[in-house]
């Protein structure tokens, strides 16, 4: 979800996992010059919305864990080369980073995120992905508002009311 540079040789990586929810990993090596690959981790795959298979230390109540190995679970076809898709991926990753604050796992949220990664990568039309993403994520997290159709009907009625009173 998010990467924070800690020093020249280490970064903190916030990842949302199916089993543990939001987890903080320390990844060593490859922050500036030097090697891009460290301890079985290719740093180039640590991008916003990367769907990874990871191996780390045992999660036993610690808040910071060490990542030992990572590889892509889903290899994007278009996301890596399309700047618009990359910008949307950064927006989605930042939204997830800000909204998923606790280390609680939720299979529905994890599956939704994975489906959105594939959708962002493969969809021909990406214009409305950001608003749909936020709306559907809000509903999954329990912040669901009025359905979109009702909102559009209210907006249309308000617009007609404004036009008729002018």
Please provide the spans of the model-predicted regions.
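Non-catalytic alpha-helical scaffolds and adjoining flexible linkers that form interface surfaces
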Residues: 1-11, 16-166
């Amino acid at each position: 979800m998010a990467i924070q540079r800690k020093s020249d040789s280490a970064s903190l990586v916030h990842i949302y996992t199916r089993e543990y929810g939001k987890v903080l990993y320390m990844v060593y090596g490859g922050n500036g010059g030097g090697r891009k690959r460290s301890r079985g981790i290719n740093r180039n795959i640590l991008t916003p919305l990367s769907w990874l298979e990871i191996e780390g230390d045992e999660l036993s109540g610690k808040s910071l864990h060490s990542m030992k190995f990572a590889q892509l679970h889903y290899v994007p076809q278009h996301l890596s080369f399309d700047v618009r898709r990359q910008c949307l991926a950064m927006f989605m990753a930042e939204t997830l980073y800000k909204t998923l604050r606790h280390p609680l796992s939720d299979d529905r949220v994890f599956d939704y995120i994975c489906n959105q990664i594939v959708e962002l990568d493969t969809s021909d039309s990406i214009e409305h992905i950001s608003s749909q993403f936020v709306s559907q994520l809000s509903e999954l997290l329990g912040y669901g508002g009025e359905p979109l159709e009702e909102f559009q009907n209210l907006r249309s009625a308000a617009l007609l009311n404004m036009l008729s009173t002018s």
